[in-house]
From Swiss-Prot:
Pathway: Porphyrin-containing compound metabolism; protoporphyrin-IX biosynthesis; 5-aminolevulinate from L-glutamyl-tRNA(Glu): step 1/2; Porphyrin-containing compound metabolism; chlorophyll biosynthesis. It comes from Roseiflexus castenholzii (strain DSM 13941 / HLO8). This is Glutamyl-tRNA reductase. It catalyses: (S)-4-amino-5-oxopentanoate + tRNA(Glu) + NADP(+) = L-glutamyl-tRNA(Glu) + NADPH + H(+). InterPro entries: 4pyrrol_synth_GluRdtase, 4pyrrol_synth_GluRdtase_dimer, 4pyrrol_synth_GluRdtase_N, GluRdtase_CS, GluRdtase_dimer_dom_sf, GluRdtase_N_sf, NAD(P)-bd_dom_sf, Shikm_DH/Glu-tRNA_Rdtase. Its EC number is 1.2.1.70. It holds the Pfam family Shikimate_DH. Substrate binds at residues 47-50, 107, 112-114, 118. One of its GO terms (biological process) is chlorophyll biosynthetic process. The keyword Transferase does not apply. It comes from the Bacteria. Possesses an unusual extended V-shaped dimeric structure with each monomer consisting of three distinct domains arranged along a curved 'spinal' alpha-helix. The N-terminal catalytic domain specifically recognizes the glutamate moiety of the substrate. The second domain is the NADPH-binding domain, and the third C-terminal domain is responsible for dimerization.
Amino acid sequence: MHITLIGVHQRNTPVTVRERLAFSLRELPDALLALRRYVEEGIILSTCNRVEVCAVTHDSVGGDAALKSFLAEQRGVDQAVFVPSLYIYHNEAVVRHLYRLAAGLDSMVLGEDQIVGQIKEALAIAHASGAIGPVLHRVLHGALAAGKRARTHTGIASGHVSVVSVAIDALRQHADLLKQGRALVIGAGHMAELTLKHLIAEGCSAITVINRTETRASALAQRYGVAWRPWGDLSDALAMSDMVVSCTSAPGIVVSWQMVERAAVGRSVPLLLFDLAVPRDIDQRVVEIPGVHLYDVDALEPICVTNRAMRAAEAQRAEAIIDGEVAKFMEWWVAQQAVPTIRALRERAEAIRDAEIRRALARCPELSPQQRETVVALSTAIINKLLHEPIVALRDPEAGSELVSAVRRLFNIDDATVHPSAKVT
């Protein structure tokens, strides 16, 4: 049994590739059902910064190939497009990655907590789809607990720690516009709400919310005391705005080149566009329009570098906490790896003992019932004595999965024996 994770991240994969691999929330249930044809357990995490597929498989090599094939087939993207920048983790490396991720240590914005909600959402969908089993349940709930502990006991999450807050940092370079200009927020999800909070905190008062589902737009606007407009007014709302933050979950372009070209006509101040969505909401060609400044999530990276430098000391403290939590999980994991091997080892020994005793007793019909019981008891005692030391060693958390694998090879215990319900893929 192996835990395997493959993924692409903002650090080494451009948004042009990430948006082709991204899954919307609506797509996840069907995608997870497809994933279960390849693996025992699975979960998909798709955010503006990363796309990751994590699964429990029966071997590392087969798991790697299965997850690559799944991602390519589901997204209709040739493996040659994403494999060069793909990262692959196994077992303890997967656990460490997910624990660090939940603590905000692997985020574009160091310490950000939006990832916690994204992990919980992905976990809930995977549970509802029947894709989560005991291993990933333990890993992911352990990750959430470890992340919470790291944030509680360090300053990793102090200050501005979200992609939205980084966008606001960029807006501060246009201080007059931020306080006196007109802002448009496209979307009505968590990121849109976070944008509203930051804009209001910065003193921006002329804010409009627009969303494809108008009831969500009106509810969000009412909650924060700002204006809202129906989706059909998007082009007009854009033309009346100086700052636009777009963060929908749409599968394609929401703000077209034509809309922005119209909005830029006769403008005395620059039009600032922040595209925080993946796939991207705004046609990237708008950068060619005079007076238009476009920032996508990758363009905000320089600000994030400064953020990470300021939190370096707290990050080290958080890493130490994560190390301890990963060690606890690995103790459980080694034990879980050993249990089916110990069971199979006992069954193999018992089968051999039983067969040999039957043959021996068949050759000695003169033995009395009491003598037969003595022979059976002797054989059982010998088996127990012989297996005692190997079983104690297998149960030792310090032994590691290497010993489990070695015992399975020595006693010819295969996957079908240890995992009788194993899928054939």
